[in-house]
């Protein structure tokens, strides 16, 4: 079964009506029935970004909706994922990957997920299909 990994930039674009990708992101999320997943690291990064740009209340509301929605699984990054993430981080030092990016790649590899909802070109560098 196909599953879709959702990255921070996509979550943020869905929330922020002023984001240039807001309409595309919201439309894509509403019109796809593929199972969605993200990681606890992405959840952390997204909540932190929303709070810093849009405020605590918006971050809280988004977090509560996401946790209670049932349409997305939040996967915990495992120790083995962090080991693989560190390998990726060291190997691709010229690519400007964040450590969180690397944990996402590691989880996607482990779970055999090849598609990401992201506006970050780093996923393409790692040969994942990027949508929308």
Question: What name fits each language-model region?
Answer:
Residues 66-78, 92-94, 123-132:
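Short acidic, glycine/proline-enriched helix-loop-strand junctions
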Residues 1, 105, 109-132:
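Acidic, PIN/NYN-like endoribonuclease modules and their adjacent C-terminal/linker elements
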Residues 40-41, 101, 120-121:
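Short secondary-structure boundary segments
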Residues 1-38, 51-64:
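Short, well-structured N-terminal submotif of metal-dependent ribonuclease cores
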